[in-house]
Amino acid sequence: MSETIFSKIIDGEIPSYKIYENDYVYAFLDISQVSKGHTLLIPKKASENIFETDPETMKHIAEALPIVANAIKKAFNPDGLNIIQNNGEYASQSVFHIHFHLIPRYKEDIDGFGYIWNTNEDQIDDEQKAKIAEAIQKNV
């Protein structure tokens, strides 16, 4: 995998505001600060996206996510928290080193983060849903 801005941050070539680090992961403030406390969690073992990340690395990420989330909660007491992970250009991934956004949400904030899901439940009947589920199940 080619070098990314995140690998340079891990190596200390680019400064960051470190939040948490262990042998496997590194968490730091996102420079955009979509909301106060917006943090990124990345594995030190680089992979482009979730499709290329091994289960052991994902285990370390899963262990670190609640540590970082709870630190944000204790620091700022947000009303909620989004954890977002994008895979591929068409899913809005901009740095091709797997990463997780922890975005605190505040009732009174106008944070510019519009995250509204449109529902298609009326357009997809139960038979189609069963076929979709079956197609995915066959590949587990």
Give the label of every model feature segment:
Residues 1-140:
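HIT superfamily nucleotide-processing domains
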